[in-house]
């Protein structure tokens, strides 16, 4: 399996688990890499840091649900693993601009 396929496999894992706690070590293990090596390769191949990628995907998913469902921000905040709902409205406004 080449590195592209490993990164793809780790991204698939992230997508499946967006609403769960995601361990960065577990993501790296999906690519059969150490965390430090995976961080470097992920950023090089995607142009974004791993944590930022996860944060952005959760934000986009929560924004989509906010617009297309009747779910409340507080429910979405907890669903997408925000510790408190307070930062989500501001982040969503930035995302929707």
Q: How would you describe each model-predicted region?
A:
Residues 31, 80-81:
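Core residues of bacterial helix-turn-helix
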Residues 1-5, 90-97:
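…primarily DNA-binding HTH/wHTH and HhH modules…
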Residues 34-35, 83-84:
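Short coil turns linking two alpha-helices in DNA-binding domains
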Residues 38, 42, 87-88, 92:
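Short hydrophobic/aromatic patch on the recognition helix
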Residues 13, 31-32:
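Short, positively charged
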